[in-house]
């Protein structure tokens, strides 16, 4: 099985909250696509609660588009990581990490402004696979934590697992 890019970085050295360029590529037509690792929690030390991350998924995608789309950038998708320590964001364009961090913080401010669970987009049986598994309070706790801790930038060069370590791990 091919080694995925996300498994070539040392999760024991990752900071959170932090932005990292996880991957860059070009489409056959030459459009730049960038995948960002938006790390909300320190791996293996923290995890977002399932109801909170689910609610955040519904809110975050729209709020990030409001703050990041434009000037050569268009978000394709924002999806939670299975480990519940962050989100992956795929987009057309190549914004720098600081621009992404600033948009992320602005989106977290927007999450804190949501006053009622009924304001969560697509929160119904027709548009959500587990529409009863939500918590606005947990999503706002996550947002508050991000803003209190601020958003840093994780460097691939600093986090790269050495080839010897990858071989030791039988990868």
From Swiss-Prot:
Catalytic reactions on record: S-(5-deoxy-D-ribos-5-yl)-L-homocysteine = (S)-4,5-dihydroxypentane-2,3-dione + L-homocysteine
Annotated InterPro entries: LuxS_sf, Metalloenz_LuxS/M16, S-ribosylhomocysteinase
Residues involved in Fe cation binding: 54, 58, 128
Broad class of enzyme this protein falls into: lyase
Pfam family, one: LuxS
Keywords: Autoinducer synthesis, Iron, Lyase, Metal-binding, Quorum sensing
Cofactor(s) listed: Fe cation
PANTHER family the UniProt entry points to: S-RIBOSYLHOMOCYSTEINE LYASE
Record's subunit section: Homodimer.
Protein name: S-ribosylhomocysteine lyase
Organism phylogeny: Bacteria, Pseudomonadati, Pseudomonadota, Gammaproteobacteria, Enterobacterales
